Amino acid sequence: MSPLALLTRPRLDSENLALLLRARGVASLIEPVIEIVPLAGARLPGLDRMQALLLTSANGVRALAGLLGPPPAGRHMALLAVGAASAEAARREGFENVQSAGGDVAALAALALARL
């Protein structure tokens, strides 16, 4: 019997993880227990005055991209991502100036202090 993983993250994240697991011979059952929904009417005032944006998740990256609209709008700004997955999500959304902190919020804070 093959191993089976229960994936409870939001659907998109679970689907991406299921692909990786399938490549390793692990079947997945996707049952999201949460849904990430950006706030209606959210705005980013003063974005042009910011040195960088710190992002802690791929969901945050997708929400930011949705607020900015289609590329290339705002894709030139510096993004400091908590880890590789968030950084890769930013690149997929068309952001050009992305740096990964390596995986946790302490590393992200250190990167921000060193860079800004």
Where are these regions (language model features)?
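Signature of uroporphyrinogen-III synthase
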Residues: 1-116
